[in-house]
């Protein structure tokens, strides 16, 4: 009888866990739709800015080198200092979501160590901060409650400090790493080499003439657009990471719910078997007692 009570207690416990994981799955599904929409919109806007930047950069570069006009285009032959901005979740229960990002950061740290590049980390998200603190790896800047609730102002504040350091020569390169949303069931690591700007001009190299007519202060226009470009790239990394996080958590909770269902089924079979054995034992004892009284 005590065995039956123990199995019944386990069934109740696993069933409660199943209800919890299923509820978390539904919450993540609802949040995913909102985060996915925000990621799509920010990506489209960033792409449009990229197109305009390509056009303006090409026009300016026809007359003078961009390296001399804007610090964002200055590229050193030998990179000595680099800043890595990486995004992880503030919460857990999302499968290998955070592990993939941390692995990508570690791989880049190892590569920089081999090349003797000094790296500074700017960490967004509690999970990544706790991991590198545990590893005794110094973190230059730590941002909590940002990856779980990203907004444009937060993104601007984060990237502005890094960009200022690049302009002032404190760092030679800025890279953003995050685990991005691919679809409902998968995510992918995205590494964005934000500074120095290299890709913008090359996209327009094939054009024979610019379609845009600018005022004399075209460098100022490009400078302002570049700042917006950096800000939206940072913002996209935050919202894209959040969408991927909800996707990973939804998948993890779905797997946990299915595992709980399977466990309840196993425990029910064990309960029925134990109950049948208990009844059989009782019947044998009754029959034996009756036989002994004859």
From Swiss-Prot:
It comes from Campylobacter lari (strain RM2100 / D67 / ATCC BAA-1060). Signal peptide: none annotated. It is a peripheral membrane protein. One of its GO terms (cellular component) is proton-transporting ATP synthase complex. Produces ATP from ADP in the presence of a proton gradient across the membrane. The gamma chain is believed to be important in regulating ATPase activity and the flow of protons through the CF(0) complex. It holds the Pfam family ATP-synt. The gene is atpG. This is ATP synthase gamma chain. GO terms for biological process: proton motive force-driven plasma membrane ATP synthesis. F-type ATPases have 2 components, CF(1) - the catalytic core - and CF(0) - the membrane proton channel. CF(1) has five subunits: alpha(3), beta(3), gamma(1), delta(1), epsilon(1). CF(0) has three main subunits: a, b and c. Its main location: membrane. It is found in: Cell inner membrane. The keyword Ion transport applies. The lineage of its organism: Bacteria, Pseudomonadati, Campylobacterota, Epsilonproteobacteria, Campylobacterales. One of its GO terms (molecular function) is ATP binding. Keywords: ATP synthesis, Cell inner membrane, Cell membrane, CF(1), Hydrogen ion transport, Ion transport, Membrane, Transport. The keyword Transcription does not apply. Transmembrane segments: none annotated.
């Amino acid at each position: 009888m005590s065995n039956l009570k123990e199995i019944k207690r386990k069934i109740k416990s696993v069933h409660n866990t199943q209800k919890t994981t299923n509820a978390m799955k539904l919450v993540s599904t609802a949040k995913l739709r909102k985060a996915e929409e925000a990621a799509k919109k920010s990506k489209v806007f960033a792409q449009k800015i990229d197109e305009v930047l390509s056009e303006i950069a090409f026009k300016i570069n026809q007359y003078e080198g961009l390296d001399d006009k804007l610090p964002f285009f200055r590229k050193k032959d030998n990179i000595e200092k680099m800043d890595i901005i990486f995004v992880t979740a503030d919460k857990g229960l999302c499968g290998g979501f955070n592990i993939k990002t941390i692995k990508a950061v570690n791989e880049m740290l190892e590569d920089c160590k081999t090349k003797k590049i000094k790296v500074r980390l700017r960490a967004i998200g509690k999970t990544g901060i706790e991991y590198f603190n545990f590893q005794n790896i110094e973190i230059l800047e730590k941002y909590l409650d940002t990856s779980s609730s990203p907004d444009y102002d937060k993104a601007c504040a984060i990237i502005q400090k890094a960009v200022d350091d690049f302009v002032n020569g404190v760092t030679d390169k800025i890279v953003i790493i995050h685990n991005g949303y691919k679809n409902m069931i998968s995510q992918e690591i995205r590494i964005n080499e934000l500074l120095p700007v290299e890709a913008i001009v090359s996209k327009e190299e094939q054009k024979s003439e610019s379609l845009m007519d600018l005022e004399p202060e075209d460098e100022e226009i490009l400078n302002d657009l570049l700042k917006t470009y950096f800000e939206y790239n940072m913002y996209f990394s935050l919202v894209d990471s959040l969408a991927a996080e909800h996707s990973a958590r939804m998948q993890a909770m779905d797997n946990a719910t299915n595992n709980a269902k399977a466990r309840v089924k196993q425990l029910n079979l064990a309960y029925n078997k134990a109950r049948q054995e208990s009844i059989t034992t009782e019947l044998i004892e009754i029959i034996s007692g009756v036989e002994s009284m004859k």
